[in-house]
Amino acid sequence: MMKKILVVFLCLCMTVITFAACGERGGGGGDEGSAAGGEASYELVSGHVYTEDSLEHQQMLFLKDAIEEKTDGAVKVTIYANEQLGDEQTIAESVVAGSCDVGFSEGSVWATVVNKPEVAVFGLPFQLSGPDAAQEVTKELIKPEMNKLLEGTDIYCLGNVYSGFRHMLSVNKPIKTLEDLKGLKFRVPNATIYVQMFEDMGANPTTTAFSETYQALQQGVVEACECDLANIVQQNWHEVNHYMSKTYHLCANNVICINRAKWDSFPEDIQNAILEAVEESEDYCFEIRATADDEYIGAIEDAGVEIYEVPAEELARMKEACQPIYDEFEGYGLTDLLKKIDDISAKYQ
């Protein structure tokens, strides 16, 4: 609790210093903050939990450069990686509160902090068929549909950080069937959708901070975990697991959100420049992930991990076990949106 309070206090201090500096430069609003100004009149503070060598951080660096270039330096972007501003939920809460400007997390995390479970709709189990489907959903649906769901909240959706498809890893035995998950102490992020999904499949989900997962696996606190290929390698989780099951159980769409009051403080030309930069960063993200996944599979194999391709019929059984989650989201009035997502996914099967 004291750590979370300290994080929020530090974020508030940065925000106060930023606004003071902006005031000295005459960047309080109006056209003085426009892209034509050539001077940093605004600052965006962004935080995330990933390491500085992660693909997520590479996208953020691309986005930082694109925003600063497209605004002629009127907007300065500062990025705090590797949980410097707290864990994923703390950063999301800070964006809602306005003590951090920008963060990205899966919809399930945003759903928790704004208390709107329907916001997790782009992160349901076994929802998308592959990267091409994920890219089309990113381009066509995520930003507009998320902002419909976020009306009345303190955050605004800018776009998406595609973190790839997630797979399961285990220490003591391979996960080959739905029954292999029964009672397994499974590390999951602190997000309702993950807990529900693994409970529905019979596991014993345990929420553990991203940075503490390696130690939890090493010490036997948990027996299994799941993540995308890049972060499995970058977090060295392949060193403490003996098996990986390619389940593609979730497409990790880390939705980029900005504090709404901060967003509304920008003139239209700045907003347009930021949105254009986000779209370019999304394209960049899909490009670098397309070439990286084979390398990560190789690194996992080289560590001696036994990799198992779960058959389609077994994946169908796992998805069927998660049907209560889909029933819940249809109950939020999202049947039409779920069909749009399904139609896109079916195009690439």
At which residue positions do the language-model features occur?
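Positively charged n-region of N-terminal signal peptides that target proteins for export
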Residues: M1-V8
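Repetitive helical segments and hydrophobic/amphipathic motifs
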Residues: L12-C13
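C-terminal motif of bacterial Sec signal peptides marking the signal peptidase cleavage site
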Residues: T18-A21
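N-terminal secretory/targeting leader peptides
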Residues: G23-D132, E151-Q349
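A gly/proline- and charged-residue-enriched helix-loop-helix capping module
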Residues: S129-N147
